[in-house]
Amino acid sequence: MDLQKIKNQILDGRNLCIEDAYELENAPLNELLEAANEVRAKFCGNYFNFCSIINVKSGKCSENCKYCAQSAHFDTKCEIYDILPFEKIMPLAKLNDDAGVARFSLVASGKGLHKKDDLQKVIEIYKKLKSHTKFHLCASFGIVSKEILAELKKSGVKTYHHNLETSRKFFPKICTTHTYDDRINTIKSALCVGLDVCSGGIFGLGESLKDRIDMAYELKNLKVSSVPINILTPIKGTPLENSAPLCVDEILRSIAIFRLILPHVFLRLAGGRNNLKNSVKTALNGGINSAITGDFLTTCGDVAQSDKNLVSECGFVYKKSFDV
């Protein structure tokens, strides 16, 4: 396995084949990170993109995803509430907008927006956000129909978020209340109605590096434009509460391989970045070019500023708005 040759092939515009991707498990980590950074610079430039989310509906989810605090199947003591009113959403939205965050997403627990009044509520919220902010608006509402996705697009949503979470092979070990194809079909429906798609997964569910690579190729085949990388934070009360954390080198290796497989995407550092400990900068110099900043109804201005300082130190130029 010749890493230099693989890197040059990718820089020349050729795809990394899955067999070579599997072999990268044994590549020297520093060289792998350098290759990923070079590929990111070639295909994405030095621009960095931030997004923020708000959990507009919490708890009582019918699905049994083993990592999730919001599943009704587990006793996690998570907060439970229905769709928040716009008046509770706008303060966080304004903080993010003023801080220069590019993207803002409403996220709701549950398999999908199956109550008609929930759909109408979020549509009205999006219309108001569109008129009051400069955000690229995103939505994350689970498994929904093409008709609902079209309605969301009409209300101002530009990107739909729906993770694959892991590989097709490993998925049944994580969730049994819906299928991998349910998720893929939702992504295809979003693309069909003209939405961009943000889809990634969680590292540290018990999967292998091969599973992560398989997921990356699923995402590549779907042609998603943004790929969030979450690192499991075990939640007390879930079946994964005692999961052993991934070592930092394993996380960094996985991120770098994702970049080599997916040269053009926003590779987005998302939940659980604290698992990287003191190596966040290494991840930023190893393939990452976007991130989630802030948190639900917290003062996000300082967080966004500290994150912007961090990416500037890594040589990125922060840009509030640019094409996918």
From Swiss-Prot:
Pathway per its UniProt entry is: Cofactor biosynthesis; biotin biosynthesis; biotin from 7,8-diaminononanoate: step 2/2
Cofactor, how bound (note): Binds 1 [4Fe-4S] cluster. The cluster is coordinated with 3 cysteines and an exchangeable S-adenosyl-L-methionine. Binds 1 [2Fe-2S] cluster. The cluster is coordinated with 3 cysteines and 1 arginine.
Residues given in the record as [4Fe-4S] cluster binding sites: C61, C65, C68
Recorded hits in PROSITE patterns, A to Z, give: RADICAL_SAM
The Gene Ontology biological process annotation of the record reads:
biotin biosynthetic process
Report residues binding [2Fe-2S] cluster. S105, C138, C198, R268
Asked if the Swiss-Prot or TrEMBL record annotates the protein with the keyword Isomerase, the reply is no
Query: What Pfam families does this protein map onto?
Result: BATS (PF06968), Radical_SAM (PF04055)
Q: What molecular functions are annotated in GO for this chain?
A: 2 iron, 2 sulfur cluster binding; 4 iron, 4 sulfur cluster binding; biotin synthase activity; iron ion binding
Keywords per UniProt: 2Fe-2S, 4Fe-4S, Biotin biosynthesis, Iron, Iron-sulfur, Metal-binding, S-adenosyl-L-methionine, Transferase
Which reaction does this enzyme catalyse, per its entry? Answer: (4R,5S)-dethiobiotin + (sulfur carrier)-SH + 2 reduced [2Fe-2S]-[ferredoxin] + 2 S-adenosyl-L-methionine = (sulfur carrier)-H + biotin + 2 5'-deoxyadenosine + 2 L-methionine + 2 oxidized [2Fe-2S]-[ferredoxin]
CDD domains linked: Radical_SAM
Q: Which residues form the Radical SAM core domain?
A: 43-273
Swiss-Prot/TrEMBL cofactor(s): [4Fe-4S] cluster; [2Fe-2S] cluster
Identify the EC number(s): 2.8.1.6
Among HAMAP family, the record links this protein to: BioB (MF_01694)
Q: Which family does it belong to?
A: Belongs to the radical SAM superfamily. Biotin synthase family.
Biological role: Catalyzes the conversion of dethiobiotin (DTB) to biotin by the insertion of a sulfur atom into dethiobiotin via a radical-based mechanism.
Subunit and interaction comment: Homodimer.
Tell me what this protein is called: Biotin synthase
The gene is bioB
